[in-house]
Amino acid sequence: MTNHPKMTALAVEFFARFARFEHALKEIPEFRNGDEDGVKPNWDVFGQAAEIAALYSAIVAAPKAQYLVQNPPRKRIVRSGILEWKDMPKPQNTMEVLVAIRRVRNNLFHGDKGNPNLSRNVQLFEACIAILDMALAANNDVLLAYEINQDIS
């Protein structure tokens, strides 16, 4: 993926932590959607939980976390048949911050992080990790599922 050791380590750390976080959400009945065909984390319900919704002011005040709010990840689009990046508005609440974190994950997973040596990517990964940590600290049920059940086989 890259020759930049810090970028590689952060990308792997973010991706692994994001995966564990989604797994933890699925362990909590109120934070999952699913049936016999599959299960998905319900990020919207999680983001609406009072303790999570209240995190926005802490996110914008935290030096590492605020980078995501001030410099939101761009969205990959096709305009007139040409693949482009679309600038996205700054998140105005925790729900929108969670969408931005998922966009960073999608851009990474689908290979759209571009030049991996850009300090912007490093800062986005650091911000996402910081915010996920804040969300874990705010919800004991998700934290417990995150810490105890690490088997995501």
PLM segments and residue spans:
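Charge-enriched, short contiguous segments at helix-coil
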Residues: Q92-R103, N107-A138
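Amphipathic alpha-helical interface elements
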Residues: M1-A100, G114-N115, N121, L143-S153
